[in-house]
Every structure is written in C-alpha cells, then in structure tokens.
C-alpha cells in the first residue's frame, strides 16, 4: 500500500455494469487494491479519502446502489482472515 496514515476498505453494490466498472477503475486509479469483485483496500491520507468520497459521490448511482467506505486500523487489519483461494488476493499488506 502507498504511504499514508489511513487504511480504508471500500465495498460497493452497483447494478449497472458500466458504472460498476467505472467505480472500480476510479478506485484502482486512486491506488487501492482489489480484494474481491466489489471490494478494494488501500492506504491514503485524510485529504485523499475526502477527495475519493467526493469523486464517488459525483457518480450517478441508482436508487438501490451503494458504496461504503470503512476506515480500518492496523490492529483490526492484522486480525484479518482469508478463507478459500478466490480469484482476488488480499493485496499488499
């Protein structure tokens, strides 16, 4: 993960394929790593997180679409468990 002071987990449920792909590209461009089909994790400053949230707010989400951004502390991240060997990995620690 990039240098910074805040780890974030972003998960989303978006019905429109093109918008879902666009959100994934935005998150990748911001330096987050995909850990599931609709979940990304990364490290960023508070300002970068605010900027990311503003960019995501500007997307034309449908009435049932949702994006959640969770701050995660190092202690909680270290307690992470991965069960199975799905297509996506955890990304850099």
Curated annotation (Swiss-Prot):
Matches recorded under InterPro entries: CRISPR_associated_Cas2, Virulence_VapD/CRISPR_Cas2
This enzyme's EC code(s): 3.1.-.-
Gene Ontology BP terms: defense response to virus; maintenance of CRISPR repeat elements
Domain of life: Archaea
SUPFAM superfamilies per the UniProt record, alphabetical: TTP0101/SSO1404-like
Pfam family, one: CRISPR_Cas2
One GO MF term attached to the UniProt entry: metal ion binding
Disulfide bridge positions per record: none
UniProt entry keywords in alphabetical sequence: Antiviral defense, Endonuclease, Hydrolase, Magnesium, Metal-binding, Nuclease
Binding locations of Mg(2+): 13
Cofactor: Mg(2+)
Function per UniProt: CRISPR (clustered regularly interspaced short palindromic repeat), is an adaptive immune system that provides protection against mobile genetic elements (viruses, transposable elements and conjugative plasmids). CRISPR clusters contain sequences complementary to antecedent mobile elements and target invading nucleic acids. CRISPR clusters are transcribed and processed into CRISPR RNA (crRNA). Functions as a ssRNA-specific endoribonuclease. Involved in the integration of spacer DNA into the CRISPR cassette.
Similarity section: Belongs to the CRISPR-associated endoribonuclease Cas2 protein family.
Subunit structure: Homodimer, forms a heterotetramer with a Cas1 homodimer.
UniProt protein name: CRISPR-associated endoribonuclease Cas2
Organism, as annotated: Korarchaeum cryptofilum (strain OPF8)
Lineage per the UniProt record: Archaea, Thermoproteota, Candidatus Korarchaeia, Candidatus Korarchaeales, Candidatus Korarchaeaceae
Gene behind this protein: cas2
